[in-house]
């Protein structure tokens, strides 16, 4: 699919997953760092396969990078998150589902990823810290849970081993209903043709 885009800006890096690494998602961090080590330019923008950014926000994302490029007190840019759950009309609003996270980081600082979700900055060789970051006020649209229970349980059976645990049984009815809210915004155009299928 990626190769079919045929954009000279896109470079696919072939890599091998370490199936022996099954400790707290560290293999995701390994793959993330392979990509980061191959990035050029001033910033690295980390986007997972189930995350989308709205076309209306792209100019503001670029502007944020321009504003903070030469600010030594800013090492990363943080995005808010919409976590869609079960369908594209429902989102989860709870501290248990990370509400914001750094997704853009400067390429000029020493950083590493202990898993796929976040970065740590190394001021010394023995201790890491969260990057100094600015909020963009922009949201990331996370569609990873917009699947049927059957699809989610299949996914769990395949990926949970990388976290050192047994596959979780996904049952949407067990979610605390008080944290499920109706999504009131507009979806990115890139998911326009996909949404009817996931809302069935």
Whereabouts are the PLM-identified features?
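Acidic donor-binding segment of Leloir-type glycosyltransferases
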Residues: 1-23
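Catalytic-site signature of metal-activated, phosphate-bearing donor transferases
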Residues: 25-29, 33, 52-200
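Conserved catalytic core of Hanks-type protein kinase domains
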Residues: 38
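Short aromatic/hydrophobic "clamp" motif used to bind/position activated sugar donors
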Residues: 44
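Active-site acidic Asp-centered loop
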Residues: 47-48
